[in-house]
Amino acid sequence: MPRVLVANRGEIAIRVFRAAVELGWNTVALFTENDSSHATYADERIQLDGPLDYMNVQKIVECAINSKATHLHPGYGYLSESPELASACFSDNIVFIGPSPETLRIASDKMRSRELAISLNVPVAAGKRVNSAEDVIELARGVQFPVMIKALDGGGGRGIRICESENEVGEAFKRCLGESPSRQLFAEKALKGPGWKHVEIQIVGDGHEVVHLWERECSVQRRFQKIVETAPSSLPRSSVQPLIDSAMKMAAALQYRSLGTFEFMVNATTENWVFLEINPRVQVEHTVTEEITNTDLVQAQLKLSLPSNTLSSLSLSSKQMLPTGYAVQLRLTAEDPAKAFQLSPGAIRPEDIAWPAGRGIRIDTWLSSLEGQLFTVGTDFDSLLAKVIVHGASFEEATQKAKRALKELRLNANVQTNAAVLHGLLEHPDWSSGGIDTLWLERNLDSVLGLGKPATSNFQTGVASAVPTSTTSSASSYVTLQPGTIFHLNLFSNEKPSDTSTSHTMTLSSIALNTFPERLSGTLQTSFSGLGVVNFDLSQSTSSASTAALELADPNNPSHVGSPLTGKVVELHSALSGSDGGGRIRKGETIAVLSVMKMESVVSAPRDGWVARVPKGVKVGVVVGEGTLLAVFEDRSRL
């Protein structure tokens, strides 16, 4: 019996486990200490040392060998497009569920896949590999700004920046380099005009024959991250057919095996189109293709990894899988639209969630466990909470079903979401008319939020209960915390037993860092009888020394520079390298770089000044919360 190890986490791991179990396969999960909900769906579980192990080829293969896995499914992201992982599996007689290493060396490399397209007369945007900011500027002088810098191995919006002028190139190049695992980049002419839609073709191959499973449209994006996907596309068939033909031609040239997606940009006005890239793996949005073709794509992947199976034997052909109806996928993320879509970390209890249900509604999420546990949203992984997938006989029916699904969805936790954006999008007239391009959301965000907020006024009604219902020793881990939460506690003397207690009130007045129950620091405002109001610094006893040493910035103190978001410090200005400060920083200089969900955000100096002090906890590798004090400035010109 096949035994598959899934080298991934979250909803995609659960998706693969479910598909494998239905085929009678044994399953093995990898998990980390504070992220294990997906592992409850597997037969065997292996704990990793930390999130970085998901990117460690040697560690992943070692886990597969030790668990006696016959197959390895990489999911999406992480090492899913790694020819090194595929080769290592082959060397150790483990079946890699995906394309061959030879195919991956071309398909996962954006430059080599462009070269393949060019050799087959498939149009691409002007571009080249770049090793420096100067290379980008040289390209721009030939094709004119704007240009786009991309990581060769980027994805999910990571490793991508648009430059409108020369003075933006240096910082953009540096950030893309930091977000690229291979630290390899290329640049191309950016397609920023109105009307450009993102359309992708789903193919599946057995190494000899290739078929397509129609197209998906992914034009609803923000900062190159897909938010909503539909199938089929809103474009006329005459605009889609050349994309299908090109995808089939390229896949055939690669002798493609397993699932693959070929991405294109199409201008709905001019009908111009170009090839973008190949995603040689299962996509986040594979669900909408499954809905319109009534095909389990993940099971198809698993079956095609067995040498006896072919497309023909599995009855997989485009003629047999004609699209039926329309499907929409809405990505619910832990991002706060009111704060420029910053990650909203926090804890979610199972009882805080209510998912929509009914015919034609499907939920793929990691906020699900066979054992019941606290879910923690942190900075180590992406912000995706759930995928809400609907299917209807028509586009209008699918839209109405999506509206109902969002209306029924409840998340009563301190984690903010993009629900208002999803609601507002479906209410906007451009959604119904098909008038959405890849920059539409950025142009129309205010109106989208205006339409969406009334529909989500009751979406997050706050903490269901500040007091845990359980009285066991582990109950404290089920307390959901946010500023303003009031605790009613009974305090007993440690000196002698007592049958009486005095009631006091404690209010969590501010939070420096909250990825509770993993870490928490902030300020408690406490009212004691006869003593008035007393403020206490709050930190978990299990916190690291560096976390406990973090401080909150005072927004009213002009000398304080606070973190605008929650993230891991990956770079600090040399002037912040010591707690005593002393270095000079000019306005606009980068004082810190924070990594959030593998994307880097720059914190710039708001003014000229000298660093007078740096909190002891601020150092590379530490997770800081929104509002955490990064440095104290002083203006020596006044001395």
Regions found by a protein language model. Give the residues of each.
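Short acidic loop-to-helix transition motifs that present clustered carboxylates
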Residues: 129-136, 168, 192-195, 568, ...
